[in-house]
UniProtKB/Swiss-Prot annotation:
Domain of life: Bacteria
Residue intervals of the Radical SAM core domain: 160-397
A GO cellular component entry from the record: cytosol
Protein name: tRNA-2-methylthio-N(6)-dimethylallyladenosine synthase
Gene3D superfamilies membership: Methylthiotransferase, N-terminal domain (3.40.50.12160), tm_1862 like domain (3.80.30.20)
Organism for this UniProt entry: Mycobacterium leprae (strain TN)
Subcellular localization(s) per the UniProt record: Cytoplasm
Listed CDD domains: Radical_SAM (cd01335)
Record: residues binding [4Fe-4S] cluster 2: 174, 178, 181
């Protein structure tokens, strides 16, 4: 137990409103959870700190952490060390650590960073406001980790940042046992929401003006086998049925999902994707390795032949679908022959984009105990070869699109060079990032959330350029909301950038991708 100085101020006495920041590391599930954490804090009376504020400028800083890769640990504890002097100078400041790393390291976070005030896990997000109050009142650090899910995150308040796109969680947890992954032990076995609850959430989002939803789960193809409601019968076809049901929601223009698992990917899902107009022609299908021997060691319950068969079926049903993947380089025991097999599959499939990871040894996973851990220099050299090949393929595939007309959902915050290049940015239906030029008459009219069409004029490995002007422009309610700065913030609703993973990234940083399925 870590005690605090007795001089912690009571903001209720001063009348000031405490501000907060939520910093997110890892996968899209963490992004979804961070929306809920922000919503909980706002419902409790906290105010979001200015977007340009540095880490530590807020009264409360929450780190929502990832435990998948070693860099996540280093990044968290580096940031906590950075905050230590600020905490000493401002004892009223509170620091909370949650998420997968907190769930894993519940007994060590405070020993490594004793100035932390709150440690909470993946199953009790809703406890954060109470823990903050308790820590301030008792002047003692609060550690609360529970081992089973208390509430679906989607039942908690949400503070969404996007007027046009939202995450919708369909399940939590995972029933797989990949040897490299610690997530199932931290998030628990899969638990599925009822279709009625999911569709009600989607309909509420659309009523708020949202145009695109991403259905989110650790393994969406297993949806329907572990319903939380015991009255619902196990149904292997539930995910395909859910996609088709989303297709009947008036005003919902784009549906995405992530992530499926090749072992459980079935043809009824492919049919639903192809036959449901608002389901986007994009598929993120983790491969991890092109070697059957390595897949077996990873405990991935499929082999390359099955994977390629799925890709063939998808391309037959949706010839222009963008297919993205996850790849791990340097898994223990991986030989040059194994790695060459991965390169062969990459050449065959021609992924639109790939999240490429160097294997990271994680304590608590079976892979950490395997022999044949590879030298970093070998892993780095293979990684560079894989990235070079995928970059080449990305460029070739994107060049094919020059001259094509594409529909874009205009976004905000995705074009880092937009101001310098006098361009704006949108996402095509297949998930590709497109930077487009604004004609002077259009500049004030096009808002994030609006729909436009443009012609592709240039290509790069991770984006397209459309400098021939805007061909058509359709104003939307999402655009109206953005223009009015009235982002919907609702109980039980989800958020944020357009579908994951984003086409336009070839390698996964620890801050954007996290756990690979």
């Amino acid at each position: 137990m870590v005690t605090r100085d007795a001089g912690m101020a009571d903001d209720a006495a001063t009348g000031s409103t405490r501000t907060y920041q939520v910093r997110t590391y890892g996968c899209q599930m963490n992004v979804h959870d961070s929306e809920r954490l922000a919503g909980l804090l706002e419902a409790a009376g906290y105010q979001r700190a200015a977007d340009e504020a540095d880490v530590g400028d807020a009264d409360v800083v929450v780190f929502n952490t990832c435990a998948v890769r070693e860099n996540a640990d280093n990044r968290l504890y580096g940031n906590l060390s950075h905050l230590a002097p600020r905490k000493r100078n401002n004892p009223d400041m509170q620091i909370a650590v949650g998420g997968c790393l907190a769930q894993k390291d519940k007994h060590t976070v405070l020993s490594k960073a004793p100035w932390v005030d709150i440690v909470f896990g993946t199953h009790n997000l809703g406890s954060l406001p109470t823990l903050l109050d308790r820590a301030r009142h008792n002047k003692v650090a609060q550690v609360e980790i529970v081992e089973a899910l208390q509430h679906f995150p989607s039942s908690l308040p949400s503070a969404r940042e996007s007027d046009y796109a939202a995450w919708v969680s369909i399940s939590v947890g995972c029933n797989n046992s990949c040897t490299f992954c610690i997530v199932p032990s931290l998030r628990g076995k899969e638990v599925d929401r009822s279709p009625a609850d999911i569709l009600a959430e989607v309909e509420a989002l659309v009523a708020d003006g949202v145009l695109e939803v991403t259905l989110l789960g650790q393994n969406v193809n297993a949806y329907g086998v572990s319903f939380a409601d015991p009255a619902l019968a196990r149904n292997r076809g539930s995910f395909a049925e859910l996609l088709r049901s989303c297709g009947s929601i008036d005003g919902l223009e784009r549906v995405r999902f992530t992530s499926p698992h090749p072992a459980e990917f079935t043809y009824d899902v492919i049919e639903a994707m192809a036959q449901t107009p608002n389901v986007c022609p994009s598929l993120h299908m983790p491969l991890q390795s092109g070697s059957d021997r390595v897949l077996r060691a990873m405990r991935r319950s499929y082999r390359v032949e099955r994977y390629l068969g799925i890709i063939g079926q998808v391309r037959a049903a949706m010839p222009h679908a963008a297919i993205t993947t996850d790849l791990i380089v340097g898994f223990p025991g991986e030989t040059e022959e194994d790695f060459a097999a991965t390169l062969d599959v990459v050449r065959q499939v021609r992924f639109t984009a790939a999240f490429t990871f160097q294997y990271s040894k994680r304590p608590g996973t079976p892979a950490a105990e395997l022999g044949g851990q590879l030298p970093k220099a070998v892993v780095q050299e293979r990684y560079e070869r894989l990235v070079e090949l995928q970059e080449q393929i990305c460029m070739e595939e994107n060049r094919v699109l020059i001259g094509r007309i594409v529909e874009l959902l205009v976004t905000t915050g995705e074009g880092r060079k937009d101001a310098r290049t006098a361009r704006r940015t949108g996402r095509a239906r297949d998930g590709r990032l497109v930077h487009f030029a604004l004609d002077t008459p259009w500049e004030a009219q096009v808002r994030p959330g609006d729909i436009i069409t443009v012609m592709v004029t240039e290509a790069a490995p991770h984006h397209l350029i459309a400098d021939a002007g805007i061909l058509t422009h359709r104003r939307t309610r999402a655009g109206d909301a953005h223009a009015a700065r009235q982002c919907p913030r609702s109980i039980g609703l989800g958020q944020i950038p357009l579908g994951m993973p984003s086409v336009g990234q070839h390698s996964a940083s620890i801050g954007s991708a996290g756990c690979a399925r």
